[in-house]
Regions:
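Acetyl-CoA-dependent GNAT
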Residues: 3-6, 10-16, 21-99, 107-112, ...
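Structural motif
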Residues: 22, 120, 142-143
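Short hydrophobic/aromatic beta-strand or adjacent loop that forms the aromatic wall/cage
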Residues: 60, 160-164
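Active-site acidic-Proline motif in GNAT/NAT acetyltransferases
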Residues: 97-99, 103, 131-132
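Short alpha-helical segment within the catalytic ATP-binding CA
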Residues: 104, 108, 135
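Conserved GNAT acetyl-CoA-binding A-motif
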Residues: 118-128
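Conserved beta-strand-loop-alpha-helix junction that forms the acyl-donor binding cleft
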Residues: 127-136, 154-159
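Conserved acetyl-CoA-binding loop of GNAT-fold acetyltransferases
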Residues: 141-149
């Protein structure tokens, strides 16, 4: 029998390359055909290892899911960036490498971020998703989120709708 260790922990120095790899793969999988190609490439390129190294060094709230010594996903979160919405916290990003999706790791990452937000006084929080990202909409809906706001988001010359899920 083979045992595989799955842990969720705070990102640390040395994780930046693996987080950047997950970001690249997850964004290509989630947004190809939704975000215009050139814009998608530009957005991915901005989030290379140096960006993640700086986020870790700044002490950003950033969790990673470590599966058998491989970073399979990450979540970043903190204070809500839209004060007009009455939610204290926000999960900014929650992504898994495509090969780790659909096995419960996303829920585990969500619950870990939710717990840390609550531990820091944020009992309610938001998560934004693009309206065309059907998998994300289903995922956040199954977790109990309800759509509380719709807003446009520009990607180059094109506009897409994004939706905010509220969790109380």
């Amino acid at each position: 029998m083979v045992e595989t260790l799955v842990t969720i922990r705070t990102a640390r120095h040395g994780d930046e390359i693996k987080i950047a790899d997950v970001h690249d793969a997850a964004w290509r999988d989630a947004y190809r055909g939704i975000i215009p190609g050139r814009e998608l490439e530009r957005m991915i390129a901005r989030r290379g290892p140096a960006w993640w190294r700086n986020a870790i060094a700044r002490g950003s709230r950033l969790l990673v899911l470590d599966f058998d010594d491989r970073i399979a996903g990450y979540a970043s979160y903190g204070r809500n960036r839209v004060p007009a919405l009455a939610y204290g916290g926000e999960i900014f990003e929650l992504y898994l490498a495509p090969e780790f999706q659909g096995v419960g790791f996303g829920r585990r990452m969500f619950e870990a971020a939710q717990k840390d937000l609550a531990d820091h006084g944020y009992r309610s929080f938001l998560i934004w998703a693009l309206a065309e990202n059907v998998r994300a909409l289903g995922f956040y809906g199954r977790l109990g989120g309800r759509i509380v706001r719709r807003a446009p988001e520009k990607f180059g010359e094109e506009t897409r709708e994004r939706v905010a899920f509220g969790f109380d």
